[in-house]
Amino acid sequence: MTKTEELMTENAKAAQEIIARNAKEVDRERRFPRENITALGRCRVLGLLVPVEHGGAGGGLAEMSRALEQLAQACPSTAMVVLMHFCGTAVIAAKGSTKLKQALLPAIARGEHLTTLAFSEPGSGGHFYFPVSQARPNGHGFFLNANKSFVTSAGEADSYVVSTRAVNAKTPQESALFLVDKRAEGLEVLGRFEGLGLAGNASAPMRLHNVAVDAEHRLGGEGSGFETMLEVVLPHFQIGAASVSLGIAAAAFQMATTHVSARKYEHAAGAALAEIPRVQFLEAEMVLELRSARAYLAETIRRAVSGDPEAMLDVIGIKARAAEASLAVVSRAMTLGGGAAYASPGGLERIFRDAQAASVMAPTTDVLKDFLGKAALGLPLL
């Protein structure tokens, strides 16, 4: 573990007590975990991916993965908010103008600025990398018009990395990314999140109507959005989402293991549930799911960091693998928890609901498997 990784892991632990304490309320009240995000900002976790020269920790994919898995064990809603913040931060650091980076990255490093992505649109569904919305020039910058379907931290973030088709785009791949301030005129949140799980991540539709942004707020060159999504957003999001899934699975495993070890049968002379062979079998299956998915995640990170030309296939696959491993572990944990797991809100029941999101979060598990199947057959992915 690197020094940066050790530092950020310890910093994440410092906020863990607050986050874990709030998790049930965040879920029950379906409220944004503002206290948790403030705590993470105070201990500099939000600046994990900010380069050192801008006051951040200079962390990378491995550090991000560890922090997100740890956060997800306490509160998956909070972990999802932080994941999308990390993705937005990575884009700003990689593609922002010098002026924009100097203005924003130190504030992010200090935990004073929360950002997020605004990619998904009704017109392209799970294929978020193909926006149908449009940017048009206004003389000194651009007007943005877009309908976004699922924006994490909608109405709560300080800025949004927004995707649209590029000016004069002729293909869906010709897209552009812009940084939009939360105070921008014409930016509107439509409704509130009412999903099955991740109840506190404030994922809601947003509308941009003639939102004016200056040229300095375009992230990358004209028509470079698709490339940025592949090179910057996809690795961070896929690996981060996989880490959140494994954090959820680890929490479920721990809850179930604690339950079966403590549960005694009075009619059987105090025998523990853990002594039943079927219980041991389910425990073994959970261990195998967790360990195999974690090994795949570690290998994916290693290949991505080293620049392995085959890394993209693993980046595509890891979110699907971790999502399925999480569902498998959580399902077994619910079985081991018995009626108490289903009847007690805020514990395993909450984790069960939170685990469902990864499979339908774009790119969905089905879309990712479609990509992998095409790659295995030597067919074009898009």
Placement of each model-derived feature along the sequence:
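A short core secondary-structure module
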Residues: 147-188
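Glycine-rich phosphate/pyrophosphate-binding beta-alpha loops
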Residues: 149-154, 234-240, 358-361
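C-terminal helix-coil-helix/basic helical segment that borders enzyme active sites and/or dimer interfaces
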Residues: 20-28, 290-321, 334-342
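Glycine-rich beta->alpha junctions and the first turn(s) of the following alpha-helix
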Residues: 193-289
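Glycine-rich flavin
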Residues: 32-42, 46-152
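Residue-level recognition of alpha-helical structural elements
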Residues: 4, 8, 29-33, 60, ...
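Glycine-rich phosphate/cofactor-binding loops in nucleotide/flavin-utilizing enzymes
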Residues: 339-382
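Amphipathic alpha-helices that form helix-helix packing interfaces
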Residues: 242, 249, 256, 286, ...
